[in-house]
């Protein structure tokens, strides 16, 4: 399992596509006490879906320990997405383990059963988990002894 955390920093924006490559799940986190991060979620989600249209996504509202009223707000954009949504506190640990378990379960299921129109998943299955590994690599590996 590889976990990438860009902390929403703009300096990582150009690197985002490299993080999406080979992803089987995504946890998107916004700060429930700062509306700007909720607004940015729309940008992050759209960008991620451009690169990974099918992977499962869980959206998280963090920092509920700072203002418990945030759990009573309406988050229409997230409701419209129809993706799992939870509240967490990284400071006191509320729901943190649950979120990682849920994401891992979704990612494992996605990897085992990718959508039929997810051609990248099919290509990666042919290549194996690493380039040059897997059934296709065994058939095409050149040991140098054969002539072309």
Predicted regions and their residues:
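Switch II (G3) loop of P-loop NTPases
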Residues: 1-14
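Structural signature of beta-strand start/N-cap positions in the alpha/beta core
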Residues: 2, 24-25, 56, 84
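WD40-repeat beta-propellers
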Residues: 2-4, 37, 44-46
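Generic enzyme active-site microenvironment
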Residues: 3, 29, 60
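Short acidic active-site motifs
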Residues: 11-15, 37, 95
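Conserved Switch II/interswitch segment of TRAFAC-class P-loop GTPases
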Residues: 22-42, 52-55, 64-70, 91
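Conserved P-loop small GTPase signature centered on TRAFAC-class small GTPases
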Residues: 53-148
């Amino acid at each position: 399992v590889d976990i990438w955390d860009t902390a929403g920093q703009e300096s990582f924006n150009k690197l985002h596509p490299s993080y999406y490559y080979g992803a089987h799940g995504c946890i998107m986190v916004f700060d429930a006490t700062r509306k700007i991060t909720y607004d940015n979620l729309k940008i992050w989600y759209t960008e991620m879906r451009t690169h990974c249209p099918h992977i499962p996504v869980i959206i998280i509202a963090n920092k509920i320990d700072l203002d418990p009223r945030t759990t009573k707000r309406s988050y229409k954009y997230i409701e419209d997405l129809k993706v799992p949504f939870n509240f967490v506190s990284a400071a006191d640990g509320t729901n943190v383990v649950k979120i990682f378990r849920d994401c891992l379960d979704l990612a494992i299921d996605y990897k085992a059963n990718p959508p039929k129109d997810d051609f990248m998943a099919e290509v990666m299955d042919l290549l194996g988990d690493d380039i040059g590994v897997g059934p296709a690599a065994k058939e095409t590996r050149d040991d140098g002894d054969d002539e072309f």
